[in-house]
A protein has these predicted regions:
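Short, flexible N-terminal segments of the mature chain
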Residues: 19-47
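Short, extreme N-terminal segment that most often corresponds to the first beta-strand
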Residues: 1-28, 144-145
């Protein structure tokens, strides 16, 4: 049995408040990277830090305090579009991309673009390429073995 290995990263983008952004990212399995923009401002990007090599995480374990003060661990969903919209400077677009494969059996790709208003577009290669391929001809086979 083969394992899926994915890798993900974002483009670089400007954030409203660097400390708030970095504080929130500390909750997620990501590495924050920076580079200098053309105007000298610091731009931020993310690299997936999934220890299993699976690409972007869509949930994380959070420690919440129960009614009696005990710490409860729970899985919480990560809505990346909402996260980026909350932090992006107006006019900037964050793009989250992931590619991966399970040997040569399944090859996949995903991209999400989102702006500060929360408007977004996504591409899922495993889903979207079929619609395009069928416009070119009637004989289209699966990309797998």
């Amino acid at each position: 049995m083969a394992n899926y290995y994915g890798i993900g990263r974002t483009n670089y983008f400007a954030v409203k408040d660097a400390e708030l952004f970095k504080d929130e990212m500390a909750n997620y399995p990501v590495e924050v990277v920076t580079r200098e923009g053309e105007d000298g401002t610091t731009l931020y990007g993310l690299l997936d830090a999934n220890a299993d090599g699976g690409g972007w995480e869509w949930s994380y374990v959070a420690e919440l305090e129960g009614e009696d003060g005990e710490v409860i661990e729970t899985d919480l969903e990560i809505d990346w579009a909402e996260v980026f919209a909350r932090h992006l400077v107006d006019g900037w677009v964050a793009i989250l991309m992931e590619t991966g494969a399970e040997k040569y059996r399944y090859v996949s790709g995903y991209a999400l673009a989102v702006n500060s208003k929360g408007e977004s577009h996504e591409i899922n290669l495993s889903r979207d390429i079929w619609k395009l391929a069928e416009t070119l001809g009637e004989n289209v086979t699966e990309v797998a073995y």
